[in-house]
Amino acid sequence: MNKDTIFSAPIEKLGDFTFDESVAEVFPDMIQRSVPGYSNIITAIGMLAQRFVTEGSQVYDLGCSRGAGILSIRRNLQTNQVKIIGVDNSQPMVERCRSHINAYHSEVPVEILCDDIRHIEIKNASMVVLNFTLQFLPRADRLELLTKIYQGLNPNGILVLSEKFTFENQVMNELLIDLHHTFKRANGYSELEVSQKRTALENVMLTDSIETHKDRLKQAGFSQIELWFQCFNFGSMIAVK
């Protein structure tokens, strides 16, 4: 696993964070050291696939990055009669995802598309995953995407929505942000790395509160919604049609 050192030296002109070649190269290390509970979420996505994915249906991983979620799903399926569709708009991520998926033999077909997730038709889906993806979309586009997902899910289909959260109570919000930064420092990131990455992300990752997410999911059509995992200001929700 290549180590993330992208923000380790001072960057004079710090632009917005993008999922480019340099990020794709170190992404597994970056996300493990940056997102508390990430491996637990990936493992649980496989468990949820085992329970919810049905024969003859499709599974979508929207914002699939290098394919960790897809591999977890595929390992846990009860049937081979399923198609998994992964979508990411970063070509470097897609290339590595395809290579990663092809390294493990399976009878389950997987298609990896380089596209904007807002352009993808969702149909005959028993499971859709948005793993730390929605927060990178403009807020104005989020409800439309979730509504499309709801409409494309079969009855009893599941959406897994993992996000970084903001909290309306400012004291708690600052505490959880600080704990997250402590987590990153404990994983070997310097103050400079934490600071520069935060600055690079502030215009492209727009976080919402848990309440906002629940309200939006209800507007999209879901009625069964629950937060099933949280560590500091990161977590994951499930919504069942």
Swiss-Prot record:
Keyword Coiled coil: no
EC number(s) stated in the UniProt entry for this protein: 2.1.3.-
Subunit composition and interactions: Homodimer.
Entry protein name: Carboxy-S-adenosyl-L-methionine synthase
Taxonomy, superkingdom: Bacteria
SUPFAM superfamilies cross-referenced by the UniProt entry: S-adenosyl-L-methionine-dependent methyltransferases
Gene this chain is encoded by: cmoA
Assigned protein family: Belongs to the class I-like SAM-binding methyltransferase superfamily. Cx-SAM synthase family.
CDD domains: AdoMet_MTases
Enzyme class: transferase
Gene3D superfamilies the record matches: Vaccinia Virus protein VP39 (3.40.50.150)
Reactions catalysed, as given in the entry: prephenate + S-adenosyl-L-methionine = carboxy-S-adenosyl-L-methionine + 3-phenylpyruvate + H2O
GO biological process: tRNA wobble uridine modification
Ligase as UniProt keyword: no
Function according to Swiss-Prot or TrEMBL: Catalyzes the conversion of S-adenosyl-L-methionine (SAM) to carboxy-S-adenosyl-L-methionine (Cx-SAM).
A Pfam entry, by short name: Methyltransf_25
Keywords, alphabetical: S-adenosyl-L-methionine, Transferase
Amino-acid positions noted as binding S-adenosyl-L-methionine in the UniProt annotation, renumbered to this chain: Y38, G63, C64, S65, D88, N89, D116, I117, N131, R198
InterPro entries named among the record's database cross-references: CmoA, Methyltransf_25, SAM-dependent_MTases_sf
GO molecular function: carboxyl- or carbamoyltransferase activity; S-adenosyl-L-methionine binding
